[in-house]
Every structure is written in structure tokens, then in C-alpha cells.
């Protein structure tokens, strides 16, 4: 899980979602998981 000021999809499978007022990227590749913070 990377915590970045700006989250961007890294591949075609990445999905940008909002959970509990947080912007997150979920993907089949665990290295692509990101959270804004």
C-alpha cells in the first residue's frame, strides 16, 4: 500500500474508488494499491 498525495491508475486493471472519504486505487497487482493521504 503506497500513500501518495496524488493517486493515479498505473495500469488498465487499476480502479479508483472512494472509501470513507479516502481516494484509493485497487488492482489485481498488489504493488499498485494506493491510498491518498
Swiss-Prot record:
Superkingdom to which the source organism belongs: Bacteria
KW Ribosomal protein (keyword) present: yes
GO molecular function, one term: structural constituent of ribosome
Keywords: Ribonucleoprotein, Ribosomal protein
A GO CC annotation given for this chain: ribonucleoprotein complex
Record's keyword annotation contains Ribonucleoprotein: yes
GO biological process, one term: translation
Family statement: Belongs to the bacterial ribosomal protein bL36 family.
Name recorded for this polypeptide: Large ribosomal subunit protein bL36
Species of origin: Mycobacterium leprae (strain TN)
Underlying gene: rpmJ
Amino acid at each position: 500500500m503506497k500513500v501518495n498525495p496524488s493517486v493515479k491508475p498505473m495500469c488498465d486493471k487499476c480502479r479508483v474508488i472512494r472509501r470513507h472519504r479516502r481516494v484509493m486505487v485497487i488492482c489485481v497487482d498488489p504493488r499498485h494499491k494506493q491510498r491518498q493521504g
